Amino acid sequence: MNLRDKLDVYMRLARMDRPIGTLLLLWPCLMALTFAAGGLPDLKVFIIFVIGVFSMRACGCIINDYADRKLDAHVERTKGRPLASGEVSSKEALLLFVVMALFSFGLVLMLNPLVVQLSVIGIILTIIYPFTKRYTNMPQMFLGTVWSWSIPMAYAAQTGTVPVEAWWLFAANWCWTVAYDTMYAMVDRDDDLKVGIKSTAILFGRYDRQIIGLFQLAALSCFIIAGMVADRGAIYAVGILAFIGFGLYQQKLINGRERAPCFTAFLNNNWAGMVLFTALMLDYLVLG
């Protein structure tokens, strides 16, 4: 394998070719920076967090594939991943993980000590998450914590503290993550049952749509409260209405519990996050 092919394999291992996860991680992070700054965030902090989202998502994907390398070969959607297919060795994957983790840690060293302390917790959570699928039926809930950890970090970077209002946004994103990652798990449910991988899609069973709906409603409520605490106005309210519309569309897609529509519903959450963040930013810029 030549250098170009090897780099292509590493890019796929880090999911650089599939940015959906990065975007789902990015929107709440940018919302946190915007709420914390009361508008446009500090440029240095903004750049560090955008780069950090990409690098930490890569870390998460690599350690996830390392943990699942023997199981992924038996799952239709994941059998072509570089570790499962043998295109890259376990040692190479671990080395790439360490490099990306050190790069990410180097980024936060340019910020204040509180952010550095929170980042250590973040990397530990990232390492633990892939293994939760073996021991609990609720790995999506653990992922919600991992996926939301950038929110207190963003507040800490922008303000030097993590105020109470940060946790409303944390709760909103936690519930939202559980909802959309359960949609994602519905795609793999049949394969996961065969190989022993646990998920909320399996745990919720025939009540999956209803429970996803409850998490969507809880996320919506917390996003509304976060906006009220920050005294947001009509433009943010329009974003909230759009978020409701996206949620209803996703419920329609997962109604039949078929793989392709469930995956489409998962992907649709990127648009929901982008629209809500855009509405928040415009609300600050236009209404002050």
From Swiss-Prot:
Its main location: membrane. It is a multi-pass membrane protein. InterPro entries: HB_polyprenyltransferase-like, Prenyltransferase, UbiA_prenyltransferase, UbiA_prenylTrfase_CS, UbiA_sf. Its EC number is 2.5.1.39. It is found in: Cell inner membrane. GO terms for biological process: ubiquinone biosynthetic process. Pathway: Cofactor biosynthesis; ubiquinone biosynthesis. It is an enzyme of class 2 (transferase). HAMAP family: UbiA (MF_01635). Gene3D superfamilies: UbiA prenyltransferase. Its cofactor is Mg(2+). The chain crosses the membrane at residues 20-40, 43-63, 96-116, 210-230, 234-254, 262-282. This is 4-hydroxybenzoate octaprenyltransferase. One of its GO terms (molecular function) is 4-hydroxybenzoate polyprenyltransferase activity. Belongs to the UbiA prenyltransferase family. GO terms for cellular component: plasma membrane. It catalyses: all-trans-octaprenyl diphosphate + 4-hydroxybenzoate = 4-hydroxy-3-(all-trans-octaprenyl)benzoate + diphosphate. Catalyzes the prenylation of para-hydroxybenzoate (PHB) with an all-trans polyprenyl group. Mediates the second step in the final reaction sequence of ubiquinone-8 (UQ-8) biosynthesis, which is the condensation of the polyisoprenoid side chain with PHB, generating the first membrane-bound Q intermediate 3-octaprenyl-4-hydroxybenzoate. Keywords: Cell inner membrane, Cell membrane, Magnesium, Membrane, Transferase, Transmembrane, Transmembrane helix, Ubiquinone biosynthesis.
